[in-house]
């Protein structure tokens, strides 16, 4: 895959027959999902769940890009392969959700998305 510009990357991700997999559930969201099926929300179980998604047969050729949660981009699969490498081996491009939620602005009803500050350190 030789994608040098933002336009080439965007075109690849949404090329014919491909979609985007939103695998960016936060840990609290993942916990709710696991609680509903009686599975403890440990880092290992979340990793196994994500690995199951990324290694699925239907991933190759159908998913152009995967949106990841902050924890996921640093995780390795059970065999030690980084989950990012698992995704790229399926022909998909990984990306990361950088926002960390909303914060109220002063006394108004408006809010601001957090997450860009401190991005380099993360």
Question: Where are the language model's segments positioned?
Answer:
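Alpha/beta catalytic barrel-like cores
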Residues: 1-122
């Amino acid at each position: 895959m030789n994608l040098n510009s933002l336009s080439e990357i965007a075109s690849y991700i949404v090329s014919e027959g491909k979609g985007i997999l939103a695998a960016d559930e936060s840990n609290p969201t993942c916990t709710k999902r696991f609680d509903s099926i009686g599975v403890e929300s440990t880092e290992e179980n979340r990793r196994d769940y994500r690995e199951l998604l990324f290694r699925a047969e239907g991933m190759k050729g159908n998913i152009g890009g995967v949106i990841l949660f902050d924890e996921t981009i640093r995780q390795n699969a059970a065999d030690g392969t980084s989950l990012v490498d698992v995704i790229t081996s399926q022909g998909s491009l990984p990306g990361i959700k950088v926002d960390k939620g909303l914060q109220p602005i002063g006394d108004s009803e408006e809010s601001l998305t957090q997450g860009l500050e401190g991005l380099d350190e993360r």
